[in-house]
């Protein structure tokens, strides 16, 4: 600001002398020794050189007031800075980081302060509960301001005293949010969450849960912990979570981060961690980084007792029926039910469900541990692999003995009992008619085939490719649960071993080389006479060859080199291509239900025997390998 009577700084020292003269006159400063040296100079030669006619007393006073105001402003800033260091330097203050800044960064631009405020406000998410921006703005603004400008908050405009008071009050309310913001700066957020959980609840979170590495693994029971939840939101969670679950156990404790709820939730259906994160983030209004979600340890008695005892306290809120894994490990009557493992019960289960594969037995029986005490004892055993192998071996023995004890009529009746009703035999009859096969002729051939009549023990279905030969034969073999042999294994001595336990067998797609092999080695097989079969790691066994179906593109009766097979096979030609509709579905459905309907309709035509000894509609009495139990009390 130029003083009155001065047009500008000008050239040389003209402007300086004009200001200095006024300041010297009114401030009473001591004259320097350099100026005393020229005190003898009267300045008569400079009379009239400076025109001070325009300088008035008002201009002199204005300059003095401006200087005084600048000095007072600087003194006030120093006083405010000293006061803030005194009041905000305690350990419990959320704004204590201000005192760590350097004094060399005290000048602040007003525009930068406003931009820093805007960034701080925009970075705070609105929770929808109260004045979130007001509660979180001040601590964030202090950190941002200290990092960029180094000045105190009180120098950012307005009354310094009122701003300082507001920061202290709001900072006390927003301390929990400040702690959460500090959490995001941690190098290992999960470790910080686990540490805080153990500090608040006195128990390690990892002791309550088992770890799922994948977020896509589904489970019905989950243990969830949330950090930095508002008190009103935590209270309303007990109502908001009910539509999503069958049971919940919620306990809430407070810390300097806010409310920390611990939840054991059984959802209405199995959910994965990613789905639960989305649900809880919506209900609790917290980011997923502030959530711990893992399934509980279902077989840990300590975990069951923890949730059982805390459920009885006044800090917990429960809803719904208690999960069975807690009841089983905490109530006395259920503890009596824990017995040692019984292999016979496992074998009975595998036999009833017709499961003979080791892996399938292990997987499906382990899934019954929640509802079956013997399965739970199986999981607790250290010999699970041995039990699975023994169970599969015994099941196969029982199944093999059961099949051998049945005749063909009993076996077909047994297979029909395993299949639901609702099929139609007409699809099979129409398909045979489509292939120009007389239905009555087919029934006569099938009757002799099922009885194993010599010279009629083998049916050959031949024709061009894509005529449905394999489809027809495979559907029949699947219904009667027969065995399939492949000529590709003919170099092995054991390739005929599946015929040992088969009621009906199939050799699919026999080539000319296969027919030569049959003509050379398997003539007695086609006759249905007893023969000897080599078995791997076991001695030879003498069996009667079961009825055999062969599909081929070659008609053996047309080849004179196979003349010894002409009387041993019954040939049925399939000349027409298998039909499909416009959607690619087969026109004739060759399914198990249709084959059941076929045999039920043609039972008397096929001369199959009725079981006169059957009871309650069952061809054989139910197999039972579990000893009976006396339920009477002493």
UniProtKB/Swiss-Prot annotation:
A GO term, aspect molecular function: ATP hydrolysis activity
InterPro entries: Helicase_SF3_DNA-vir, P-loop_NTPase, PPV_DNA_helicase_E1_C, PPV_DNA_helicase_E1_N, PPV_E1_DBD, PPV_E1_DBD_sf, Rep_E1_papillomaV, Znf_lg_T-Ag_D1_dom_sf
A Pfam family hit: PPV_E1_C
A Gene Ontology cellular-component term: host cell nucleus
Catalytic activity: Couples ATP hydrolysis with the unwinding of duplex DNA by translocating in the 3'-5' direction; ATP + H2O = ADP + phosphate + H(+)
Compartmental location: Host nucleus
Domain SF3 helicase: 437-587
Polar residues bias (residue ranges): 91-115
PTM comment text: Phosphorylated.
Location of the region described as Disordered in the Swiss-Prot/TrEMBL record: 91-128
Enzyme class: isomerase
Subunit-level organization: Can form hexamers. Interacts with E2 protein; this interaction increases E1 DNA binding specificity. Interacts with host DNA polymerase subunit POLA2. Interacts with host single stranded DNA-binding protein RPA1. Interacts with host TOP1; this interaction stimulates the enzymatic activity of TOP1.
Listed name of the protein: Replication protein E1
Naturally occurring in which organism (per UniProt): Human papillomavirus 69
Gene: E1
């Amino acid at each position: 600001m130029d003083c009155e009577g001065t047009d500008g700084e000008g050239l040389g020292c003209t402007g300086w002398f004009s200001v200095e003269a006024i300041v010297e006159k009114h401030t009473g400063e001591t004259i320097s020794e350099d100026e005393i040296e020229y005190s003898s100079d009267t300045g008569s030669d400079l009379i009239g050189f400076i025109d001070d006619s325009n300088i008035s007393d008002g201009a002199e006073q204005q300059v003095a007031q401006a200087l005084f105001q600048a000095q007072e402003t600087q003194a006030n800033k120093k006083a405010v800075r000293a006061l803030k260091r005194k009041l905000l330097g305690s350990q419990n203050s959320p704004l204590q980081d201000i005192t760590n800044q350097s004094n060399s960064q005290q000048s602040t631009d007003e525009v930068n302060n406003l931009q820093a405020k805007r960034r701080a406000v925009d970075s705070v998410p609105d929770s929808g509960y109260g004045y979130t921006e007001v509660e979180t703005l001040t601590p964030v603004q202090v950190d941002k301001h200290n990092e960029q400008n180094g000045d105190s908050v009180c120098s950012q405009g307005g009354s310094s005293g009122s701003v300082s008071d507001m920061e202290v009050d709001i900072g006390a309310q927003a301390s929990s949010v400040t702690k959460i913001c500090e959490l995001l700066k941690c190098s290992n957020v999960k470790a910080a969450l686990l540490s805080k959980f153990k500090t608040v609840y006195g128990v390690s979170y990892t002791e309550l849960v088992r770890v799922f590495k994948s977020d896509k693994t589904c489970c019905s029971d989950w243990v969830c912990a949330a950090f930095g939840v508002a008190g009103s939101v935590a209270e309303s969670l007990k109502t908001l979570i009910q539509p999503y679950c069958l049971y919940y156990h919620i306990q809430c404790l407070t810390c300097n981060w806010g409310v920390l709820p611990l939840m054991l939730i059984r959802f209405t259906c199995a959910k994965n961690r990613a789905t639960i994160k989305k649900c809880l983030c919506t209900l609790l209004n917290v980011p997923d980084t502030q959530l711990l979600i893992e399934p509980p340890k279902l077989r840990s008695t300590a975990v069951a007792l923890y949730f059982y005892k805390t459920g009885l306290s006044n800090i917990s809120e429960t809803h719904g029926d208690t999960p069975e894994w807690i009841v089983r490990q905490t109530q006395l009557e259920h503890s009596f039910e824990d017995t040692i493992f019984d292999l016979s019960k496992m074998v009975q289960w595998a036999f009833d469900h017709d499961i003979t594969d080791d892996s399938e037995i292990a997987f499906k029986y382990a899934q019954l541990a929640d509802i079956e005490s013997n399965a739970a004892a199986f999981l607790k055993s250290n010999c699970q692999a041995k039990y699975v192998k023994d169970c599969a071996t015994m099941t196969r023995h029982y199944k093999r003995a059961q099949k051998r004890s049945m005749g063909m009529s009993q076996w077909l009746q047994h297979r029909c009992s395993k299949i639901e009703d609702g099929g139609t035999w007409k699809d099979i009859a129409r398909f045979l008619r489509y292939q120009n096969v007389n239905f009555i002729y087919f029934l006569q051939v099938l009757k002799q085939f099922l009885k194993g009549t010599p010279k009629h023990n083998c049916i050959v279905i031949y024709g061009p490719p894509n005529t449905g030969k394999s489809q027809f034969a495979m559907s029949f073999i699947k219904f009667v649960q027969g065995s399939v042999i492949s000529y590709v294994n003919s170099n092995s001595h054991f390739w005929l071993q599946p015929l040992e336990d088969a009621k009906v067998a199939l050799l699919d797609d026999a080539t000319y080389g296969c027919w030569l092999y049959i003509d050379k080695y398997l003539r007695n097989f086609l006759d249905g006479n007893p023969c000897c079969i080599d078995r791997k790691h076991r001695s030879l066994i003498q069996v009667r060859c079961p009825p055999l179906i062969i599909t081929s593109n070659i008609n053996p009766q047309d080849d004179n080199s196979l003349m010894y097979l002409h009387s041993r096979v019954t040939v049925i030609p399939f000349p027409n291509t298998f039909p499909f509709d416009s959607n690619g579905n087969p026109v004739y459905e060759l399914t198990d239900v249709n084959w059941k309907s076929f045999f039920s309709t043609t039972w008397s035509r096929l001369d199959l025997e009725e079981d006169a000894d059957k009871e309650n509609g069952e061809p054989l009495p139910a197999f039972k390998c579990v000893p009976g139990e006396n339920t009477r009390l002493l």
